[in-house]
Amino acid sequence: MTTVGVSLFRRSPEKITMKIATFLGLSFLLIASYFLICEAQHPGFQELLILEENMRDPENSKERSCAKPRENCNRMNILCCRGECVCPTFGDCFCYGD
């Protein structure tokens, strides 16, 4: 009787391996979906980091004190070098002009 009860609770190594693989696969999908959702909610996050880095760099401070045409102008209160800051209904504001 005890051998029947013990055999019911034993699991084959294949089933354990499949459960671990499934868990790791689902974990990867969850992390990837969080990344994609974050990128969708905050588009251009990498551009912002590059812009902040350039603004702090003393060599580029004069060159990057204003936004060039077609660059974003609504971040960090950056003014346009030439032209004006245009904000469409959807999307980021950008510098427009010569």
Curated annotation (Swiss-Prot):
Predominant location: secreted
Tissue specificity comment: Expressed by the venom gland.
Top-level taxon: Eukaryota
Subcellular location: Secreted
Keywords: Disulfide bond, Ion channel impairing toxin, Knottin, Potassium channel impairing toxin, Secreted, Signal, Toxin, Voltage-gated potassium channel impairing toxin
Residues of the signal peptide: 1-40
GO molecular function, one term: toxin activity
Prosequence residues removed at maturation: 41-64
Cystine crosslinks: 66-81, 73-85, 80-95
One annotated Gene Ontology cellular component of this protein: extracellular region
Task performed by this protein: Inhibits with low potency Kv1.2/KCNA2 and Kv1.3/KCNA3 voltage-gated potassium channels.
Domain notes: The presence of a 'disulfide through disulfide knot' structurally defines this protein as a knottin.
Protein family membership: Belongs to the hainantoxin family. 17 subfamily.
The protein's name in its UniProt record: Hainantoxin-XVII.3
Originating organism: Cyriopagopus hainanus (Chinese bird spider)
